[in-house]
């Protein structure tokens, strides 16, 4: 990165410690004076027209908050890595398209959340709803941000013409799971719905959310990462006890948006179960 410092319009921000993704990204966003900000992982590679396609999509509708790239596996370029993220009724945050053929994703569409690994965000809406939550050291911070935008009445969309190639997990060494990722998941899986669902939704969704969390807890313990998971869980409860959840106040005008999110998360159980029970089991592409 230092080799770029002599280039025009380039600013390098160096931190003396590992601050986590959210804190570091917020530093850059705070410096930005443009209409949009773009995030791009250090383990990703963009097509030449990637940025132009993101800008074209965002310019078409002022209600669009985030534009998601079509992220493709770097070493298996016929397969997608991420075509947008979603949250289920049980609180699972998942990728769309992981391991499926890129040819399936050709149309622009609204998505629940944009992956922050390669996405464009409208700066004015960031200023309104706030940046990335720095309590999410890594993982789910982009889902939290997109969910807040949904709750405020804005949209996130997939732009399949904006293609990039991603070496998944290169930054953390976690293509699937490790202790670090397990700890982050244990904490952020609790914070994500508590931050973004109003009280009535949390009451209505208590049983599926509790069941989902117990299933996750069982899975991580079975895979040998129970200690890390439990550590993350205790961190979440410590934040709640300290009153540092950062939950946005309920606004009556946002009620239609909350209802839409509730219905969307219920519906998202369909693609989630289809992927887990059919696509993965039979190795369909």
Q: Predicted segment positions?
A:
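Acidic donor-binding segment of Leloir-type glycosyltransferases
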Residues: 1-17
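Short aromatic/hydrophobic "clamp" motif used to bind/position activated sugar donors
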Residues: 37
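Conserved donor NDP-sugar-binding/catalytic core segment of glycosyltransferases
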Residues: 44-87
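A short, conserved alpha-helix in the catalytic core of glycosyltransferases
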Residues: 54, 112-163
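A recurrent flexible, glycine/aromatic-enriched loop bordering the glycosyltransferase active site
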Residues: 80, 92-93, 100-124, 143-145, ...
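Catalytic core of nucleotide-sugar-dependent glycosyltransferases
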Residues: 162, 175-202, 223-243
